[in-house]
């Protein structure tokens, strides 16, 4: 069985949001990141989630990035509220993860969850007819990412 993986990474600037729906239509997964050191970043993440709300994306993640900087950076004046992030994740039916900008082991659970949720969406009977209409598409960049490949190996659906 071969899966086509399409991965789009879009900048969070306002001028790029007008194209967001074009990329999200037909997507199986959306991962929206925000910078925990900036409350404005969480606000932008919420705007992105609002923008894609009608795109019928079955699997969504809200990821809080740069958790390590909260303890190492001294001049953070307006960090994002974890309570607000939890509320936003619940309001938009997102799984919520905290991520560290320097440690790879914080990213692995996101890839593992994404892979397992995609596989659940497809179902365990991996036939072409089960993929039709499920919007399963992952791009080369993500498919070749070591964390994504490891999550495939770690997934309960692909164990020997």
PLM regions and their residue ranges:
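Adenine-nucleotide cofactor-binding loop residues
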Residues: 11, 37, 102
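Amphipathic helical hotspot of TIR/SEFIR-family domains
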Residues: 33-61, 113
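Conserved Switch II/interswitch segment of TRAFAC-class P-loop GTPases
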Residues: 27-46, 68-76
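Switch II (G3) loop of P-loop NTPases
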Residues: 2-17
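Structural motif corresponding to alpha-helix initiation and N-cap regions
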Residues: 13-17, 42, 79-82, 104
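Conserved P-loop small GTPase signature centered on TRAFAC-class small GTPases
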Residues: 1-2, 57-62, 66-160
């Amino acid at each position: 069985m071969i899966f086509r993986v399409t991965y789009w990474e879009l900048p969070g600037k306002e001028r790029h949001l007008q194209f967001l729906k074009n990329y999200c239509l037909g997507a199986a997964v959306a991962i929206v990141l925000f910078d925990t050191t900036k409350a404005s970043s969480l606000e932008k993440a919420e705007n992105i989630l609002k923008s894609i709300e009608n795109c019928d994306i079955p699997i969504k993640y809200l990821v809080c990035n740069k958790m390590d900087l909260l303890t190492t950076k001294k001049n953070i004046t307006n960090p994002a509220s974890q309570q607000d992030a939890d509320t936003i994740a619940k309001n938009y039916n997102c799984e919520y993860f905290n991520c560290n900008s320097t440690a790879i082991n914080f990213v692995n659970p996101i890839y593992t969850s994404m892979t397992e949720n995609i596989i659940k969406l497809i179902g365990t009977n991996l036939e072409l007819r089960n993929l039709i209409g499920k919007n399963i598409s992952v791009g080369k960049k993500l498919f070749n990412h070591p964390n994504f490949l490891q999550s495939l190996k770690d997934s309960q659906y692909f164990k020997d």
